[in-house]
């Protein structure tokens, strides 16, 4: 599956410091990526049935900041992202709207590509749909079965026999990604695609690895597994192991993926590659974006779509600036005021870098680098740019190179394009 075009990332003098990031599993700041060489990043992708709302954009912009900071520190970045282009919510939406699920997925992925391109998000090197990785995922399920780390469940209520599940008790580290208690995990499992009440499971938390074919559902041949399709969590695990190896430097996604998705994915990986654990050196989770006091979600329908904002005349750089003005781990609310503030800030910054000269900007570059290296503190970086812009407005300045350095700093590190 193709991704999208690579935005221009201006060159900057010098190099940034090593990045430290909040790790969900330990609850503290940890250095991420090597001091030299290649950093690896896996970010869970969309289920394509309502393309990019601001909650999505917040996540992919957040981890784009990480990739930019890594590259600025002199690292190569291997970045993989999936698309969950066959899953129950997608199939349900397709049936409800009378659209073929494949056409729905492709149309929404195309919108997503356009949104990411507009927001100047650097694309992953490998952008993979689950449909094109079914053989890979099925192989992982067969490997788990062969290792005694998977089991089949008989059908219920007239359903077919043979669904394959993963026994969470097989991984001694299960529960360490999110640190939730059993009651919370059971509630989140039921809320987020699990089936804790299914008869025949050894543990209510055990996740589905392979769903055998049901009438009217897409299915693929998978040898001893029979015709069927993958469960959600094993998809990302199999793709990440194939294209990044283990351990990954950072496994990332929205905070609603901590459990069950990332917890289960790590457990799968630990059983598939027991000598290479942990699955990831750090787990990073972005905050949720709300509208009218409620988290944006497809199920609630309270979505602000990036494509609609841009179609309404809002520059994509303004949308990105609104996002990076909020710390990547915080929950925040999209409002007209947030948009107005971002628009006004973008205008001030654009005017300042259009001037023939300004105050020296080397210290600003250093500050932006320091802020991003400290848990991707983009709001701190934005505040530093604001301070330089205000100084430029009140004192003018005589450094003819400064405006261009500020423009390149903002573009390269924050991903905000200034005209």
From Swiss-Prot:
Source domain of life: Bacteria
Region (Disordered): 1-20
Binding site for Zn(2+): 44, 236, 261
Cofactor note: Binds 1 zinc ion per subunit.
Subunit structure: Monomer.
Organism annotation: Kineococcus radiotolerans (strain ATCC BAA-149 / DSM 14245 / SRS30216)
GO biological process: cysteinyl-tRNA aminoacylation; mycothiol biosynthetic process
Protein name, per record: L-cysteine:1D-myo-inositol 2-amino-2-deoxy-alpha-D-glucopyranoside ligase
Sequence similarity: Belongs to the class-I aminoacyl-tRNA synthetase family. MshC subfamily.
Annotated positions binding L-cysteinyl-5'-AMP: 44-47, 59, 82-84, 232, 254-256, 289
